[in-house]
């Protein structure tokens, strides 16, 4: 009897342990899979520094172009498109975290004026939904609905990203005004060269941390190298560890200098930023402008008719 109770207790403990382990795995896996797009969010309160530099450039060191297209003017409480273009050569392959080659991903941050925000799904037209595809946008911070981020997403499918934006209504939001506003955008393609903690990724060049002779190169079992540099006068040895991915440029017996590149630079991506302007237009001002234009056109018509009437009178007097 005692043996049965013991076995039953052991089964319960094993089942409980498996359940807890599974829950931890699911939670941890979800966190890891969702962590990559929010690297900047974890480290910076605001993605745009006082100098105008967008913080993504701190990890993506290469400079690449990015484009943005928005309407010149929008009316209050209107949904419009902000199209971000991240061009690159689709044939390029980047170094992945495991050292293998793979396709490039893209990502973007869109900094809108205060009051502008992501349009709710029920306000987005079917045509715009088709352009958006399966993209899922999120706010940079819960309290900063005007700053939107997206990525990483497959670059071959989403090198052009359409953001559905809702303009504010000054009649409902007292802090919104009918003005011209700036919009800032940052877009990257490919992996970064530096992680948020300051450490290097395997998608960058590795330099020698000491001058001397390359006395030994060991190829690691999981990829990458350990390079031993011996300082000839002192006999001091320094070991530089190279992760899998970059190609080695030096060989044993070679004399190298401090900060000399030990590897190639495998990075094929980069980050770019740009800006645009948009006017939140007052409908009354538009109506006033239309009324003014209509008045001018009518005045021109009346002048032409009056001129023709005057010419007829003159002609009749001459005939008389």
Curated annotation (Swiss-Prot):
Q: Tell whether Ribosomal protein is among the UniProt keywords.
A: no
Q: Which keywords, in A-to-Z order, does the entry hold?
A: Chloroplast, Electron transport, Heme, Iron, Membrane, Metal-binding, Photosynthesis, Plastid, Signal, Thylakoid, Transmembrane, Transmembrane helix, Transport
BP GO terms, sorted: photosynthesis
Q: What residues form the membrane-spanning segments? A: 286-306
Q: How is the cofactor bound?
A: Binds 1 heme group covalently.
Predominant place of localization: plastid
The signal peptide, as residue positions, is 1-35
Specify which residues bind heme according to the UniProt entry for this protein.
Answer: 36, 56, 59-60
Annotated membrane topology: Single-pass membrane protein
Cell compartment(s), UniProt:
Plastid, Chloroplast thylakoid membrane
Record-linked Pfam families:
Apocytochr_F_C, Apocytochr_F_N
Q: Which residues form a coiled coil?
A: none
User: Subunit notes for this chain?
Assistant: The 4 large subunits of the cytochrome b6-f complex are cytochrome b6, subunit IV (17 kDa polypeptide, petD), cytochrome f and the Rieske protein, while the 4 small subunits are PetG, PetL, PetM and PetN. The complex functions as a dimer.
- Protein name listed in UniProt: Cytochrome f
Q: Which organism is it from?
A: Populus trichocarpa (Western balsam poplar)
From the broadest rank down, the organism's phylogenetic lineage runs:
Eukaryota, Viridiplantae, Streptophyta, Embryophyta, Tracheophyta
């Amino acid at each position: 009897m005692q043996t049965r109770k013991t076995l039953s207790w052991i089964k319960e403990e094993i089942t409980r342990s498996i359940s807890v382990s599974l829950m931890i795995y699911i939670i941890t896996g979800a966190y890891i899979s969702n962590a990559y797009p929010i690297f900047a969010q974890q480290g910076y309160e605001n993605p745009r520094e006082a100098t105008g530099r967008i913080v993504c450039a701190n990890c993506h060191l290469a400079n690449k172009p990015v484009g943005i297209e928005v309407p010149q003017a929008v009316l209050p409480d209107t949904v419009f498109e902000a199209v971000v273009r991240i061009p690159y050569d689709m044939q390029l392959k980047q170094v992945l975290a495991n050292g293998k080659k793979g396709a490039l991903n893209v990502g973007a941050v869109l900094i809108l004026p205060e009051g502008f925000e992501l349009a709710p799904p029920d306000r987005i037209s079917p045509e715009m939904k088709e352009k958006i595809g399966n993209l899922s946008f999120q706010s940079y911070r819960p309290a900063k609905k005007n700053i939107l981020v997206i990525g990483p997403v497959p670059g071959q499918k989403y090198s052009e990203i359409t953001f559905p934006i809702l303009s504010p209504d000054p009649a409902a939001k007292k802090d919104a005004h009918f003005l011209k506003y700036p919009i800032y955008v940052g877009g990257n393609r490919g992996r970064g060269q530096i992680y948020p903690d300051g450490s290097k990724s395997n998608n960058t060049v590795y330099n020698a941390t000491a001058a001397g002779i390359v006395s030994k190169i060991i190829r690691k079992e999981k990829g990458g190298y350990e390079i031993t540099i011996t300082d000839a006068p002192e006999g001091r040895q320094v070991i530089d560890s190279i992760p899998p991915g970059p190609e080695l440029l030096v060989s044993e017996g070679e004399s190298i200098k401090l900060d000399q590149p030990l590897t190639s630079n495998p990075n094929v991506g980069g980050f770019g930023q740009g800006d645009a302007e948009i006017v939140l237009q007052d409908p009354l001002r538009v109506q006033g402008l239309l009324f003014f234009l209509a008045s001018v056109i009518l005045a021109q018509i009346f002048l032409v008719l009056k001129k023709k009437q005057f010419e007829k009178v003159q002609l009749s007097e001459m005939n008389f």
